Amino acid sequence: MITGKTLITGVIGHPIEHSFSPPMHNNAYKLMNMDYKYVPFHVEVENLKHVITSAKTLNIKGLNVTIPHKTTIIPYLDEIDETAEKIGAVNTINFKDGIAKGYNTDGIGAIVSIEKYTSLKDKNIMIIGAGGASKAITFTLLNKNINQLIVANRSKDNAQKLITNLKNQTNFENIDFINIKKTDNVIDDVDIIINTTPIGMYPKDEVAPPIKTDKISSKHTVMDIIYNPLETQLLKQSKKQGATTIPGTHMLINQGIKAFEIFTGKTPSYESFEKPLLKHLQG
């Protein structure tokens, strides 16, 4: 039941109809007996400038930010977390004492997911793709004492921009580029593989994985940030080769849990987010 005491959080995006965040957050609120509701808000690009002022006026406590607003929302914020500023994208906004502060929980969501299965310390990691998700994850990775980062991408220019940016912001130098078609040459030297491209996403989930998988083995941990389908072709083939695989639902859940903590100061259980997500994905 919604009353005058109910606190509102939500997510802004365009489109927003297919967001999985509302069922996850609302289920956690219910299980934790918290008088909160999480609402999806459809915000078109031309109306973005009004969001922060409107949220403050309506006493909204927090907002997640999804496509296409993660970068364009930044000029309207009062403050931005150091990590989000370096990544150049915001996916979470907290409102407190009239201040709208932006955060990015995508990177930490990925890191928590990987560390559930393996340590990152001294590992050689290959990340596939050089877009926004790759930037969020790689920046966070470089603070985890890894040994080497390899960026596999079709476009060398885009990868090089990412690499230069990472080196400038972290002073981590052991970062290399490889063409996505030549990853076979380095698979044996890599411990962890992360796909951040949309290759394999529904409805094109039967296409070949972004890299060849015949050299993947039991020594590898492979994560795909795609969560629909639950198991991409990359994960299916890697599992057949003996690798430990991590589906994209893990990152989606863990970044959401971090946002929940920012909004409320409380930590929901992993299961409270996982159950409604799987229900919607499988339903």
From Swiss-Prot:
Broad enzyme group: oxidoreductase
Biological or metabolic pathway of the protein: Metabolic intermediate biosynthesis; chorismate biosynthesis; chorismate from D-erythrose 4-phosphate and phosphoenolpyruvate: step 4/7
Annotated GO biological process: amino acid biosynthetic process; aromatic amino acid family biosynthetic process; chorismate biosynthetic process; shikimate metabolic process
SUPFAM superfamilies: Aminoacid dehydrogenase-like, N-terminal domain, NAD(P)-binding Rossmann-fold domains
Keyword Amino-acid biosynthesis annotated: yes
GO MF entries: NADP binding; shikimate 3-dehydrogenase (NADP+) activity
Reaction catalysed by this enzyme: shikimate + NADP(+) = 3-dehydroshikimate + NADPH + H(+)
Binding site for NADP(+): 82, 129-133, 225, 248
Active site: 70
UniProt keywords, alphabetically: Amino-acid biosynthesis, Aromatic amino acid biosynthesis, NADP, Oxidoreductase
Residue pairs linked by disulfide bridges in the UniProt entry: none
Annotated positions binding shikimate: 19-21, 66, 91, 106, 227
Gene3D superfamilies (UniProt xref): Leucine Dehydrogenase, chain A, domain 1 (3.40.50.10860), NAD(P)-binding Rossmann-like Domain (3.40.50.720)
Pfam family membership, one: SDH_C
Record bears the keyword Amino-acid biosynthesis: yes
InterPro entries membership: Aminoacid_DH-like_N_sf, NAD(P)-bd_dom_sf, SDH_C, Shikimate_DH, Shikimate_DH-bd_N, Shikimate_DH_fam, Shikm_DH/Glu-tRNA_Rdtase
EC number: 1.1.1.25
Function: Involved in the biosynthesis of the chorismate, which leads to the biosynthesis of aromatic amino acids. Catalyzes the reversible NADPH linked reduction of 3-dehydroshikimate (DHSA) to yield shikimate (SA).
Subunit structure: Homodimer.
Family statement drawn from the similarity comment of this UniProt entry: Belongs to the shikimate dehydrogenase family.
UniProt name for this protein: Shikimate dehydrogenase (NADP(+))
Gene: aroE
